[in-house]
Amino acid sequence: MTENRTEGAPEKKTGRKARIMETALRDAHQSLIATRMSTRDMIPVLERMDAVGYWALEMWGGATFDSCMRFLDEDPWERLRVIRSRIRNTKLQMLLRGQNLVGYRHYADDAVREFVKRAVGGGIDIIRVFDALNDLRNMEVAADQVKKEGAHLQLCISYTISPVHTLDAFAEMEIGRAHV
């Protein structure tokens, strides 16, 4: 017999509403068609997506940025301009690989700072920063610049299960993250 632990418990009201962030402009085609959706293919749905009432639309990340240039012969900065011009009521969000930015190697601190400045200046409102190795030092410069630009910062960890990825290790990371 299972026990219902919430039976009789008072309803908890926080006054906060759930906010929904949609990743179709980044992750859907990254997962389904190797990040090959062109900006032209996105345009017909942008205004409808804006009207849904999402809190944010995630439209940029490492693979989308790279694929724009390498496979689609598009300028990812122009993609940002086009999307921002059609998304007027919804925040735009991106996923940033910390010190790797949207690339496949570490970049100098000044490059990280300039990239964040330009992304926010171009219309990105929210930047989710992560490091694939969960090395908080690789998130510090980007996180600092996101805050300086006045954008919304989200720090993320890459979750996995292994002998070194324990609850205690993640708890220590959380303590360190508070200082980033």
Predicted regions and their residues:
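Active-site beta->alpha loop and helix N-cap motifs at the rims of alpha/beta catalytic domains
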Residues: G61-E174
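Hydrophobic beta-strand segments of well-ordered beta-sheets in folded domains
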Residues: A28, W55-L57, L92
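N-terminal amphipathic alpha-helix/helix-capping segment at the start of soluble metabolic enzymes
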Residues: T2-I33, S85
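Short catalytic helix/loop segments, enriched in acidic residues and glycine
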Residues: T39-R48
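A short N-terminal beta->alpha junction/helix N-cap motif
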Residues: H29-R40, F71
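Surface-exposed loop/turn and secondary-structure junction residues enriched for glycine/proline
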Residues: T23-A24, T35-R36, R40, Y107, ...
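Terminal or standalone catalytic/regulatory effector modules within metabolic enzymes
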Residues: R48-C68
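Conserved small/polar residues in nucleotide/adenosyl-binding loops
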Residues: A178-V180
